[in-house]
């Protein structure tokens, strides 16, 4: 739920929370008016995300350091309303330590950088007009960057667990790249939306979910 209501409107959030038998994790900005609405709706969890009016979708993690005092007030208010809190952050050790100090229950690691590198390396993205200019690199360089990105997510997940934070991951995850992230043992939740819905257009939502669940199994 954003200030610009780009993704969902208030009535969408109300309908989902009132009709779902499952606990709802509501992603929202840290704007005071939005937080007031979230406190009235009382989802099981609120995931705090950054909001940039010029972006189509969330492009990076929260600036926890720059918004520390603001986040503390928002988190306290959500906790007062018995709402669990998660912070959507980049895989960075300093940010994870700050998140722990803020006493949130969850962090969600931003996997967008990993997903972009993976797509430029393993798909035809580089040959299209959607190519990511800063990632138009040699295959060897992309492989090195992909390994570095995975390592950052692994290291961040381990630190978070050590600090008693629950770990989720999401952004850009799909049927091609998800296994590399789902194999990280500290990650207990994956937030995946667009790729499942896109696949469901062709095979139905039920089968799209079944296919994803098969991929993320770690037997």
Describe the role of every protein-language-model region.
Residues 17, 60, 119-136, 198-219:
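C-terminal helical cap(s) of enzyme catalytic domains, especially alpha/beta-barrels
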Residues 5-32, 66-86, 131-168, 212-219:
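Alpha-helix-loop-beta-strand connector modules within alpha/beta enzyme cores
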Residues 29-65:
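Active-site beta->alpha loop and helix N-cap motifs at the rims of alpha/beta catalytic domains
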